[in-house]
Regions:
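Short beta-strand scaffold positions
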Residues: 34-35, 102, 122-123
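Catalytic metal-binding/acid-base residues of hydrolase active sites
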Residues: 38, 58, 126
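Active-site-adjacent alpha-helix immediately C-terminal to a catalytic or transition-state-stabilizing loop
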Residues: 41, 106-158
Length: 158
């Protein structure tokens, strides 16, 4: 499968989205998936995939009460505990990274058994990190130490 990370920082005509479109323009996919979140759906459409299969398992980590807040603005006492154990503890009462990786692994298991061999996936950094763990590229503890650029194309083979 090909996991394509999205960013809407510069809009769809910006360099990141255009780079993704260019990077996959010569690829042939037998199936296309997207996170249902709008920035991934918009990027998929910009790249010519107007009806990707939307799958909730491709969503970014659920940060619970911390969702859409700046880190500097958080005063939640759980934040310090989460920093110390971000793999196992739920972020803001939402989801733990370990649970996110489980749902991504379930998606990838289903994809591997689907018969599709060339998939394009429009998703988020955390999902890509979980996919790297699944593919054996790195242990879960190191999954965010590998650089994944905004707008990059990431190819994973299983």
């Amino acid at each position: 499968p090909v996991a394509v990370k999205n960013s809407s920082r510069q809009g769809m005509e910006g360099t990141e989205a255009s780079r993704v479109k260019e990077n996959i323009s010569n690829e042939q996919f037998d199936i296309v998936y997207s996170s249902p979140l709008s920035r991934c759906r918009k990027l998929a459409a910009f790249c010519g995939f107007h009806e990707p299969i939307l799958d909730d398992r491709l969503k970014e980590l659920n940060f619970g009460e911390w969702e859409m807040k700046k880190w500097d603005d958080l005063t939640d006492p759980r934040l310090e505990l989460w920093y110390k154990d971000w793999i196992h503890l739920p972020a803001g009462g939402g989801e733990s990274y370990e649970n996110q990786c489980r749902r991504v692994a379930q998606f990838l298991d289903d994809l591997r058994h689907s018969g599709h061999t060339d998939a394009c996936i429009f998703t988020h950094r955390g999902v890509i990190a979980c996919a790297m763990v699944y593919a054996g590229i790195c242990p879960i503890e190191e999954s965010f130490s590998i650089e994944v650029d905004y707008g990059s194309k990431n190819v994973l083979e299983f």
